[in-house]
């Protein structure tokens, strides 16, 4: 299927083209993009906004206790409260030139969040990524966000958004950890082949090296597809693993939302200076 990345300022604009156009990166290389992770509470959000990050990632949920009058809030489970609502978060982030990635752990907050985003759309002339884990993945839980309901709800508001669609995963230091299987990538492609938007697949750094053939197959299925390599807090993986991944895939198709010290070591090894950041 042909690429459907949007034009300048659209929510589906390729983030490399967006940040190149704004002179914030120097090459079409996914490793140049800096991430600020879990910018949920006001202090975290403010730190992210002041940072050199290009993309701000935050987590959205609906309070189960009925607080905030049913408004979506910015928090990552197991947290269920926050000093920041999505409405307040958007009002601050819109003043910046940063791209946005919103992560949903359940369907509950999706529709209400799309309504707030819709109200801000004319002020958000930048890439917007909407993320959910829609399939069970390696060592992961079967508790996923319903793919059809999620995609239908988001697309009904924003046919031009960029989707970030992942698998639930686990990683255990004492066990053999399975990678992304052929059935996992084929099921993901089956779902995404019906879409016209760009899709990035968040993949867990510690599981990627052993899954490179499967993930490369997935990327070859559409030029709308990319990978976003992320890491769990206690995962064990090496800079060599990241360099292997970088050599295996096209540099324009892989982003790295990874933690320290590997992030700094990786950027140093590939000659990208001043890019030690993952809040």
Curated annotation (Swiss-Prot):
GO terms for biological process: photoreceptor cell development. InterPro entries: Memorin (IPR019356). Disruption phenotype: Mice show a degenerative retinal phenotype at week 15, characterized by patchy pigmentation of the retina. They have no photoreceptor function from eye opening. During development of the eye the correct number of cells are produced and the layers of the retina differentiate normally. However, after eye opening at P14, eyes exhibit signs of retinal stress and rapidly lose photoreceptor cells. PANTHER family: MENORIN (DENDRITIC BRANCHING PROTEIN), PROTEIN FAM151B. Belongs to the menorin family. Essential for survival of retinal photoreceptor cells. This is Protein FAM151B. It comes from Mus musculus. The lineage of its organism: Eukaryota, Metazoa, Chordata, Craniata, Vertebrata.
């Amino acid at each position: 299927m042909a690429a459907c990345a949007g034009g300048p300022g659209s929510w589906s604009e390729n983030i490399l083209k967006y940040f190149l156009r704004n002179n914030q990166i120097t090459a079409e290389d996914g490793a140049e993009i800096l991430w600020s992770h879990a910018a949920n509470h006001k202090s975290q959000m403010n730190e992210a906004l002041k940072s050199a990050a290009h993309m701000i990632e935050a987590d959205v949920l609906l309070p189960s206790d009925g607080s905030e009058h049913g408004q979506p809030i910015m928090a990552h489970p197991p947290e269920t409260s926050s000093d920041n609502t999505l409405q307040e978060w958007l009002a601050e982030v819109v003043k910046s030139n940063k791209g946005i990635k919103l992560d949903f752990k359940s369907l509950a907050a999706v529709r209400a969040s799309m309504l707030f985003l819709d109200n801000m759309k004319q002020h958000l002339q930048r890439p917007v990524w909407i993320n959910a884990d829609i399939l069970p993945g390696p060592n992961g839980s079967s508790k996923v966000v319903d793919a059809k309901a999620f995609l239908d709800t988001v697309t009904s508001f924003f046919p031009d958004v960029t989707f970030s669609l992942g698998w639930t995963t686990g990683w255990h230091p004492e066990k053999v950890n399975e990678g992304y299987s052929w059935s996992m990538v084929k099921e993901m492609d089956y779902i995404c082949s019906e879409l016209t938007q760009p899709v990035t697949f968040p993949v867990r750094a510690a599981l990627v090296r052993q899954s490179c053939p499967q993930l490369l197959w997935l990327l070859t299925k559409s030029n709308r597809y990319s990978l976003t390599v992320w890491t769990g807090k206690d995962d064990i993986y090496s800079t060599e693993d990241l360099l292997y991944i970088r050599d295996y895939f096209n540099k324009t198709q892989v982003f790295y939302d990874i933690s320290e010290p590997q992030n700094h070591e990786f950027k140093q090894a590939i000659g990208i200076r001043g890019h030690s950041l993952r809040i």
